[in-house]
UniProtKB/Swiss-Prot annotation:
PROSITE patterns documented for this protein: FKBP_PPIASE (PS50059)
Keywords: Cell cycle, Cell division, Chaperone, Cytoplasm, Isomerase, Rotamase
Protein name: Trigger factor
Intracellular or extracellular location(s): Cytoplasm
A GO MF term: protein folding chaperone
Encoding gene per record: tig
Major subcellular location class: cytoplasm
Domain of life of the source: Bacteria
Similarity remark: Belongs to the FKBP-type PPIase family. Tig subfamily.
Any one of the GO CC terms: cytoplasm
Length: 434
C-alpha cells in the first residue's frame, strides 16, 4: 500500500492511497466464493452454481463492496502509519477501478490541531469570598412568601411591585408598530419584563385613568426596527392589585418539607439550600474566569467537522427543551448555535490538553462527593446516589465533571488568584446574567 499526505488548507488533509491489484483481486475472489455457497439460481442446487454465473450475476455488487471495504481498511492503516489524528468523518473520493491494475483513491478530512498551552501564569481569577448571613435568609424567606402570595384589588395608585391590568398601544412618530398593542394585559411589576420606563410610567396612576407614557427602546433591543427608537404608549389602566403575603404559619412552613413546622426549622432548611447554591455559584464563577483566561491566551484553529457536530448537539437540545422533534431540530438556523458550538469545541480541546499535560484521571472520591452534593437537593438523597451508582452513563458523566474540575484546579495552580469580598445577592445576580 502506497500513501501520500497533502495539506490542503489549515487543518485539512488529503491522503492518496494505492492498494495493490492483487489485494483487490484476492478479496473479490474470496467474496465470490462465499457468495457461491449461499446463492440460489434456478436450475442449480444451492452451493453448486458455476463461478462464472455467480460472477456474472453478482460480480459488480461484490466489487463495489470490496472496494468500499478496502478504502476504509486502508484509510485506518494509513492514519496509523502516518500518525494522523482525524477530526470528524472522512470523505472518500474513489478512483476508477480497472481489473488487474492497482486501485488508487483519496480521502479528505480534517485533523485535530496541535495545542501547546501558553499564558497560563497570566490568567487572572477573582475568587468570591461570601457567606450566607441572617439578612440573606430573611430576603429568601420574603421571596418564598412572594411566590406564594395572593393578589387583592385596590383603589389606590399603582406601586412598584403591584400587579396591573392594562390596555396599551405603542406608536413611533405617530405610527403604530407591530407587537406594540395589547388588551387586558396582566403585568406583575418589578420583574423587568418590560422595556425601561414602561413600568415606571404606570406607578402613581389609579384604575380607570387613561394616560400616555414616553419610553426609549434599548439600543440592543431584539427587534431591529425598534432599536434606540423613542416611542409613546397610550395606556388604559383597568385594575391595580396589591400582593398579600402569607404569614409564616405552621401550615405554610410544612409546605417546604419542614416536618415540625417551626420558623427555626424553615430558616435552617433555607440556609442549607442557600449554602449549597452558593458553593456551586462560587465554583462556577471561578471556573468561568479560569476557562475565559485559558481561551483568551490560546488561539487555536478548530476543525469545522467538530463545530458541525456540536451545532447538531445544540440544535437537538434546543428542540427538546421546546418539545420539538429531530426534523424540527435540524431546521433551526445554524447561526443561532455556531458561536456557542465553536467555543465549546475550543474549550474542550484546551481542557483536554490541560488534562493530558497534567496526566489527570478522574478522582473517584471527588466523583462520590459530587454525586452526594447533587443528591442532597432531593427528598431521598440515598435513593439518588444508588440510582447513579447503577447507571454507567451517569457515572461516566459525573467522572467527566470531576475531571473538568481537576483541570480547572490545575489552571488555578498557575493563575493569579485574588480574593474579593461580595454578597450572596451580588454573586447570584452575576451568575444569572452570565
Amino acid at each position: 500500500m502506497q500513501v501520500s499526505v497533502e495539506t490542503t488548507q489549515g487543518l485539512g488533509r488529503r491522503l492518496s492511497i494505492t492498494v495493490p491489484a492483487d489485494t483487490i483481486k484476492q478479496a473479490i475472489k474470496k467474496e465470490l466464493i462465499n457468495a457461491a455457497k449461499s446463492v440460489r439460481i434456478d436450475g442449480f442446487r444451492k452451493g453448486h452454481v458455476p463461478m462464472n454465473i455467480v460472477e456474472q450475476r453478482y460480480g459488480a455488487s461484490v466489487r463495489q463492496d470490496v472496494l468500499g471495504d478496502a478504502m476504509q481498511r486502508s484509510f485506518v492503516d494509513a492514519i496509523i502509519k502516518e500518525k494522523i489524528n482525524p477530526a470528524g468523518a472522512p470523505n472518500y473520493v474513489p478512483g476508477e477501478y480497472k481489473e488487474g491494475e492497482d486501485f488508487t483513491f483519496a480521502v479528505e478530512f480534517e485533523v485535530y490541531p496541535e495545542v501547546e498551552l501558553k499564558g497560563l501564569d497570566g490568567i487572572e481569577v477573582e475568587k468570591p469570598v461570601v457567606e450566607v448571613n441572617d439578612a440573606d435568609v430573611d430576603t429568601m424567606l420574603d421571596t418564598l412568601r412572594k411566590q406564594q402570595a395572593t393578589w387583592k384589588e385596590t383603589d389606590r395608585a399603582a406601586q412598584a411591585e403591584d400587579r396591573v391590568t392594562v390596555d396599551f398601544s405603542g406608536s413611533i412618530d405617530g405610527e403604530e408598530f407591530e407587537g406594540g398593542k395589547a388588551s387586558d394585559f396582566v403585568l406583575a411589576m418589578g420583574q423587568g419584563r418590560m422595556i425601561p420606563g414602561f413600568e415606571e410610567g404606570l406607578v402613581g396612576h389609579k384604575a380607570g385613568e387613561e394616560f400616555t407614557i414616553d419610553v426609549n427602546f434599548p439600543e440592543d433591543y431584539h427587534a431591529e426596527n425598534l432599536k434606540g427608537k423613542a416611542a409613546k404608549f397610550a395606556i388604559v389602566l383597568k385594575k391595580v392589585e396589591e400582593r398579600e403575603l402569607p404569614e409564616l404559619t405552621e401550615e405554610f412552613i410544612k409546605r417546604f418539607g419542614v416536618a415540625d413546622g417551626s420558623t427555626e426549622g424553615l430558616r435552617a432548611e433555607v440556609r442549607k439550600n442557600m449554602e449549597r447554591e452558593l458553593k456551586g455559584a462560587v465554583r462556577n464563577r471561578i471556573k468561568t474566569q479560569a476557562i475565559d483566561g485559558l481561551v483568551s491566551a490560546n488561539e487555536i484553529d478548530v476543525p469545522a467537522a467538530l463545530i458541525d457536530g456540536e451545532v447538531d448537539v445544540l440544535r437537538r437540545q434546543a428542540a427538546q427543551r421546546f418539545g420539538g422533534n429531530e426534523k424540527q431540530a435540524l431546521e433551526l438556523p445554524r447561526e443561532l448555535f455556531e458561536e456557542q458550538a465553536k467555543r465549546r469545541v475550543v474549550v474542550g480541546l484546551l481542557l483536554g490538553e490541560v488534562i493530558s499535560t497534567n496526566d489527570l484521571k478522574a478522582d473517584e472520591d471527588r466523583v462520590k462527593t459530587l454525586i452526594e452534593e447533587m443528591a442532597s437537593a432531593y427528598e431521598d438523597p440515598s435513593e439518588v446516589v444508588e440510582f447513579y451508582s447503577k447507571n454507567k452513563e451517569l457515572m461516566n458523566n459525573m467522572r467527566n465533571v470531576a475531571l473538568e474540575e481537576q483541570a480547572v484546579e490545575a489552571l488555578l495552580a498557575k493563575a493569579k488568584v485574588t480574593e474579593k469580598a461580595t454578597t450572596f445577592s451580588e454573586l447570584m445576580n452575576q451568575t444569572q446574567q452570565a
